[in-house]
Amino acid sequence: MAFSVVVLAAGKGTRMKSSLPKVLHKVGGVPMVQRIINTVRSLGADNIHLVYGHGGDQLKATVVEENLNWCLQAEQLGTGHAVQQAAPHINDDEDVLILVGDAPLIREDTLSALKAVKESCDLALLTVNLDDPTGMGRIIRENDNITAIVEHKDATEAQRAIKEINTGMMMMSGADLKRWLGELSNDNAQGEYYLTDVIAMAASEGKRIQSAQPQSAVEVEGVNNRLQLANLERALQNRQADELMTNGVTLLDPSRFDLRGTLQTGNDVIIDVNVIVEGDVTLGNNVEIGANCILRNCTIADNAVIEANSIIEEARVGEACTVGPYARLRPGAVMQKNAKVGNFVEMKKAVLGEGAKANHLTYLGDAEVGAKANIGAGTITCNYDGVNKSKTVIGENAFIGSNSSLVAPVNIGKGATVGAGSVITSTVDEAALAVARGKQRNIPNWPRPTKK
């Protein structure tokens, strides 16, 4: 049966103490509301209605989605009022799944289970059992059918002993939902329209009300402050670490690993402590990642070793390469098979050929380095004149002496040698030696300055 989703995302989130709408705060590097949208997309929803209010411009600038229906809740008058804003876009003959925008860890299989329950009843609720349900609305059942939700303050002692509580997430037919929304009243202490009132309406009509439950209570936990946000962040990281280790990745300390995107791994990958993975990252077989590294939108091929404290962003590291420690590969950096980048080397829009080496203290920008070339310590490609970027080409088997400056655009031929300390401004032919530095002058018996 066709189904639509209503995501409630209009709240300001006052306790977050932020200018950012609550649902745009990130968990695992992704805004909370975007995580929920991604989940229901994978579930196969026909339509998604996003109810927004506070920070609408920020939401629209961040959540760029096709086929997303934006429903403005100009005044925040309760959850029932929020769903009413989406009602004109809901069809009678479809089921409607209602979710909250600040519970980002809900799993696809949990929502699939809720959908399956709805197929055999009129109203399906997502409930959860808590060890301490104090302050929460209790689920009341009669012959296994849910008949009511009783708020904690109104519950009897027997009802307060019930551990099952309502999460606010539910599914019903469009026709039932719209009818019940039209009957909601704000005759309560808060003067708001509560979505949970539809449960009592359904029960009074003799509707069959059933429930599904998540694998873990953390799936339905919401965020109202920074502490809760941090707790959900850690819960997500623990979940992701468990999945990686189950799939064969060695995490030397799972509690000190952060995945803020997607990570594809081969066999026998080893990741040391304090590694952060952002965006889309792929690691081949037998890759080793040292401590304190940041990997962002990059690909690292089989048998590569990334030493500690290195940063790799939008770069490609070839098979059996070595990077670091303390190296930085910036966007457009490419290392081919068996290449090596050592400590305090930076690459940007540069290709380091097969077997080539830049072992220390080097900047390679807008450069192409041939196979088996050796780049000495302190070498700089001077690629920027203040307006334009220019390219440096270094041929295979070339040797660049330490502390050389290569002023682009410039070409160093195959097998050429550049003497240490040179400033190269023009082409160096194949197999030639280029030396371009000031002549040394020695002054005998030089009197050193003395302090007065």
UniProtKB/Swiss-Prot annotation:
- Binding residue positions for Mg(2+): 102, 224
Q: Which PROSITE patterns match?
A: HEXAPEP_TRANSFERASES
Where is the stretch described as Linker? Answer: 227-247
Pfam families in the record, alphabetically?
A: Hexapep_2 (PF14602), NTP_transf_3 (PF12804)
SUPFAM superfamilies for this protein = Nucleotide-diphospho-sugar transferases (SSF53448), Trimeric LpxA-like enzymes (SSF51161)
**Region named Pyrophosphorylase:** 1-226
Provide the GO MF annotations for this entry: glucosamine-1-phosphate N-acetyltransferase activity; magnesium ion binding; UDP-N-acetylglucosamine diphosphorylase activity
GO CC annotations on file: cytoplasm; membrane
Xref: InterPro entries: Bifunctional_GlmU, GlmU-like, GlmU_C_LbH, Hexapep, Hexapep_transf_CS, MobA-like_NTP_Trfase, Nucleotide-diphossugar_trans, Trimer_LpxA-like_sf
Binding-site residues, acetyl-CoA: 377, 383-384, 402, 420, 437
Enzyme Commission code(s) on record: 2.7.7.23, 2.3.1.157
Which cofactor is essential here?
A: Mg(2+)
Residues annotated as region N-acetyltransferase?
248-452
Cofactor notes: Binds 1 Mg(2+) ion per subunit.
Q: Which UniProt keywords apply?
A: Acyltransferase, Cell shape, Cell wall biogenesis/degradation, Cytoplasm, Magnesium, Metal-binding, Multifunctional enzyme, Nucleotidyltransferase, Peptidoglycan synthesis, Repeat, Transferase
Which cysteines in this chain are paired by disulphide bridges? Answer: none
Binding site residues for UDP-N-acetyl-alpha-D-glucosamine: 8-11, 22, 73, 78-79, 137, 151, 166, 224, 330, 348, 363, 374
Which compartment or compartments is the protein found in?
Cytoplasm
Main subcellular location of this protein, as a coarse class: cytoplasm
The active site is formed by 360
Named in its record, the pathway it takes part in is: Nucleotide-sugar biosynthesis; UDP-N-acetyl-alpha-D-glucosamine biosynthesis; N-acetyl-alpha-D-glucosamine 1-phosphate from alpha-D-glucosamine 6-phosphate (route II): step 2/2; Nucleotide-sugar biosynthesis; UDP-N-acetyl-alpha-D-glucosamine biosynthesis; UDP-N-acetyl-alpha-D-glucosamine from N-acetyl-alpha-D-glucosamine 1-phosphate: step 1/1; Bacterial outer membrane biogenesis; LPS lipid A biosynthesis
Please list the GO biological process terms of this entry.
cell morphogenesis; cell wall organization; lipid A biosynthetic process; peptidoglycan biosynthetic process; regulation of cell shape; UDP-N-acetylglucosamine biosynthetic process
Question: Per its database record, what is this protein's job?
Answer: Catalyzes the last two sequential reactions in the de novo biosynthetic pathway for UDP-N-acetylglucosamine (UDP-GlcNAc). The C-terminal domain catalyzes the transfer of acetyl group from acetyl coenzyme A to glucosamine-1-phosphate (GlcN-1-P) to produce N-acetylglucosamine-1-phosphate (GlcNAc-1-P), which is converted into UDP-GlcNAc by the transfer of uridine 5-monophosphate (from uridine 5-triphosphate), a reaction catalyzed by the N-terminal domain.
Q: How does it assemble?
A: Homotrimer.
Q: What family is this protein classified in?
A: In the N-terminal section; belongs to the N-acetylglucosamine-1-phosphate uridyltransferase family. In the C-terminal section; belongs to the transferase hexapeptide repeat family.
Q: What is this protein called?
A: Bifunctional protein GlmU
What species is given as this protein's source? Alteromonas mediterranea (strain DSM 17117 / CIP 110805 / LMG 28347 / Deep ecotype)
